């Protein structure tokens, strides 16, 4: 009989030594949902608060404190009971609501029930109507700025600022045969305007002295500048006559900015009444207003990395003319609009140089693609519901008797709950959990999808997006992807990959 060793010690005779211990493979799901409960819920309520009526006299503030245990009751049923009863494993959420009447100074406070929010089980899944579901992480293009060769043969280069929410801004350089170079811009993918029109719209400090320095630096734009400046002069003179403006240098610069606003507004909103105020509000609101434009934290981080040095270089070249980026604000700064234009023009000028600091971006590199995990996806659904609720609150403020208004009577939670239910029941990213075996369930929770709202569609996705990229190494498995129309659009996180605070995959 052979005697077996009773020692529990394992010996490893491999030449390579022990493998690195595996991390928690469910952390992509658990960490993201925990962050949503601690931070995302509060941010969503802060984004719509305060809600004011059309006169600005009445306002409603909503405040959620994740550390206040009175605002979060424990779940009614356990996971097992939810499965048996075919109900949703959820937790009641409350908010502190404060109604303020600025005319009388009256304040009414209440704790208001906002609905039952589905919560994640220990296994990283959700129980929705008794069935186990997984929310798949989405792989999307990161907000920020990208410089690429033009898609059209006459466009040499183009640079696009993609915000988290708001209008795109695109600058490009056209080079046609036997014609001088022409730089332009597009706002919200509308008709093209000259780059000089965009710069004039930024600030009244954009005077002839600035443009002379600008053209001296980018001499290949000299012909375009002289043509555009002559045309602009005629427009400015007409504008000053129309509004009876005195012919002074200050008025000339003011008229220069106003005519640029009007030209942009004409392209963006053809058919609408062209007034200076409407044009100003459109341009300022499109990129510099927090209500209509949001770069997001990721976009601000990417812009600081890509354009930070260019903004500093422009201050040296042209002087400190424009307002600089504020790290706290997730809107564009005027200095960054100028930096996007100069980066593109420097890229065109240095294209044949052996050494340059200007480089084309690869949109398929994982530095330019990020993960929207479960917490962020639920937060987006919640924001949609809250913005619908905001409209209801405004209407009720105008129709109800001011004396009898209380926070409870203003708030209708139905739009919020229907947005959350709609996400879990019908979203392309909320799926029945694969329960063939424990391993298929685990890989399902680590799945990455480029499809879904805000992502790609099977029909439009080209070969480059689907292909294996060198930046996938150690981040996403290059082998495991379905056959058929989804090939390359569905992937799986590698063993040692993790998601950083900005949603980028690290290894």
Model-derived features with residue positions:
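N-terminal non-catalytic structural scaffold regions of very large proteins
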Residues: 1-449, 494-507
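Residue-level signal for helical boundary/lining positions with a hydrophobic bias
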Residues: 126, 479-480
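Flexible, glycine/threonine-enriched loop-and-boundary segments that flank and lead into catalytic domains
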Residues: 108, 447-478
């Amino acid at each position: 009989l052979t005697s077996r060793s009773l020692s529990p010690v394992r010996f490893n005779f491999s030449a390579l030594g022990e493998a690195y211990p595996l991390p928690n493979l469910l952390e992509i799901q658990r960490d993201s949902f925990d962050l949503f409960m601690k931070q995302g819920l509060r941010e969503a309520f802060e984004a719509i608060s305060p809600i004011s009526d059309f006169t600005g006299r009445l306002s409603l503030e909503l405040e959620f404190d994740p550390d206040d245990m009175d605002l979060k009751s424990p779940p009614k049923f356990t996971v097992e009971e939810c499965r048996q009863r075919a109900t949703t494993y959820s937790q009641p959420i409350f908010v502190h609501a404060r109604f303020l009447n600025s005319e009388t100074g009256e304040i009414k406070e209440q704790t208001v029930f906002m609905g039952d929010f589905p919560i994640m089980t220990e296994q990283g899944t959700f129980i929705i109507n008794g069935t186990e579901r997984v929310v798949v992480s989405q792989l999307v293009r990161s907000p920020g700025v990208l410089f690429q060769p033009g898609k059209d043969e006459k466009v040499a280069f183009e640079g696009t600022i993609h915000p988290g929410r708001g209008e795109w801004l695109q600058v490009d350089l056209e080079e046609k045969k036997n014609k001088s170079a022409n730089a332009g811009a597009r706002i919200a993918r509308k008709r093209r305007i000259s780059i000089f029109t965009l710069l004039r719209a930024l600030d009244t400090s954009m005077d002839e002295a600035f443009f002379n320095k600008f053209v001296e630096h980018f001499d290949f734009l000299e012909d375009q500048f002289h043509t555009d400046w002559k045309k602009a002069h005629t427009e400015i003179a007409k504008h000053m006559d129309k509004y009876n403006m005195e012919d002074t240098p200050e008025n000339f610069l003011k008229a220069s900015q106003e005519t640029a606003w009007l030209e942009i507004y004409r392209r963006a909103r053809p058919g609408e009444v062209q007034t200076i105020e409407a044009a100003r509000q459109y341009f300022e609101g499109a990129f510099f207003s927090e209500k209509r434009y949001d770069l997001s934290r990721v976009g601000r981080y990417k812009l600081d990395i890509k354009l930070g040095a260019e903004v500093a270089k422009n201050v040296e070249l042209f002087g400190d003319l424009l307002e600089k980026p504020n790290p706290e604000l997730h809107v564009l700064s005027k200095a960054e609009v100028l930096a996007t234009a100069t980066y593109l023009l420097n890229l065109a000028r240095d294209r044949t140089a052996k050494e340059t600091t200007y480089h084309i971006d690869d949109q398929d590199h994982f530095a330019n693609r990020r993960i929207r995990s479960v917490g962020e996806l639920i937060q987006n659904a919640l924001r949609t519901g809250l913005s619908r609720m905001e409209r209801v609150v405004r209407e009720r403020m105008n129709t109800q008797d001011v004396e009898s208004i209380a926070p409870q009577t203003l708030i209708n939670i139905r739009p919020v709950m229907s947005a959350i239910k709609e996400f879990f029941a019908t979203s392309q990213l909320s799926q029945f959990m694969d329960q063939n075996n424990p391993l298929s369930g685990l890989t399902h929770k680590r799945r990455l999808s480029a499809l879904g709202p805000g992502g790609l569609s099977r029909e439009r996705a080209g070969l480059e997006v689907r292909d294996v990229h060198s930046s996938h190494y150690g981040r996403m498995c290059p082998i495991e992807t379905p056959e058929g129309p989804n090939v390359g659009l569905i992937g799986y996180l590698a063993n040692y990959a993790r998601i950083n605070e900005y949603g980028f995959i690290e290894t």
